[in-house]
Regions:
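Active-site phosphate-binding strand-loop segment of PLP-dependent enzymes
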Residues: 140-210
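Short acidic capping loops at alpha-helix termini that bridge into adjacent secondary structure
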Residues: 87-93, 112-113, 221-222
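Conserved PLP-anchoring active-site segment centered on the Schiff-base-forming lysine
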Residues: 109-128
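Hydrophobic residues in well-ordered beta-strands that form the structural core
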Residues: 116, 137, 197-199, 225
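Generic structural signal for small/hydrophobic residues in well-ordered secondary structure
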Residues: 20, 37, 54, 76, ...
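N-terminal small-domain helix-loop-helix segment of the aminotransferase-like
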Residues: 3-97
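Helix C-cap/helix->beta junction micro-motif
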Residues: 27-30, 131, 192-193
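PLP-dependent aminotransferase class I/II
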Residues: 224-267
Length: 267
């Protein structure tokens, strides 16, 4: 039989980072020495406190609330408040099986279009395609630290007819490894045009400086934050992420929760 798959899905391929990781494992199993630079897997062990806590709760088997454990959401809320000074109450936080799932649900729920910078993480565009959201690219350069300038962002916004737009910011960035130094300027443009910002902050605790800056500090009212254990904790295979949403975007939060309730049981 033919035509079993939607045309939009036929355009997609398996995530290149995961495919390359499997190829590397196969080569290693064959005795080959592989230097792998394409996968964000920490070589360090998961902190012992987290390991022991997981062991102590291994007997827990009940279904959980759609948004995840209240105690965990409260801890994330307090941590965000401590690090960036912005209040995302636990009621506005959803625990997901990895931050990747959180972003996918946002793409599926969102009725609009996406602004991405090039280069960017390999899964942003495929997720937008799954959500049937058109992607608009901004080409970046080394001179601007591989992030769009405020002028580039404003020019791109003016060229788009759709009113509902999400700007995705990933700082520290995958794949460049750089930190965005013009968040305040980008936030000013985003606010001017009423953009939604998705701040992918999965790498925020992996920097050579103690300063942690989030675009939400400059535009809290319409900035969503995604994060998780995968990078700083080295627990990519555990699949624990979160999605924090400001009060102004409660409609999106409710619909992400609806999608979550029909797809997985959370932590």
């Amino acid at each position: 039989m033919k035509d079993l798959t939607k045309k939009s899905i036929l355009k997609l391929k398996q995530s290149s980072t995961l495919v390359i990781n499997e190829k590397c494992k196969n080569l290693i199993n064959k005795g080959k020495k592989v230097y792998q630079f394409g996968f964000g897997q920490s070589p360090f062990p998961v902190p012992e406190k987290i390991v022991s806590t997981l062991k102590n709760n291994a007997h827990r088997k009940e279904y959980l609330p759609i948004q995840g454990l209240a105690q965990l959401r409260e801890s994330i809320s307090k941590n965000l408040k401590k690090k960036i000074g912005i209040n995302y109450p636990k009621e506005n936080i959803v625990i997901t099986p990895g931050s990747k799932e959180a972003m996918l649900l946002l793409h599926v729920a969102f009725n609009g279009e996406i602004i991405l910078s090039a280069p960017s993480w390999v899964s942003y565009e495929p997720q937008a395609i799954i959500g049937r959201n058109k992607v608009h690219w901004i080409q970046t350069s080394r001179e601007n630290n591989w992030f769009p300038t405020a002028q580039q962002l404003e020019k791109k916004i003016k060229s788009i007819k759709k009113k509902n737009l999400i700007l995705i910011i990933n700082s520290p960035n995958n794949p460049s490894g750089t930190i965005c130094k013009n968040l305040k300027e980008l936030a000013k443009v985003a606010k001017k045009y009423n953009l939604i910002v998705l701040s992918d902050e999965i790498y925020t605790d992996l920097t050579f400086c103690n300063k942690y800056e989030s675009i939400s500090q400059h535009y809290p009212e319409r900035t969503c934050i995604s994060g998780g254990l995968s990078k700083w904790c080295g627990a990519g295979g555990w699949r624990v992420g979160f999605f924090a949403v400001p009060n102004e975007l409660s409609e999106l939060l409710e619909n992400v929760k609806t999608l979550a309730s029909e797809s997985y049981s959370t932590v």
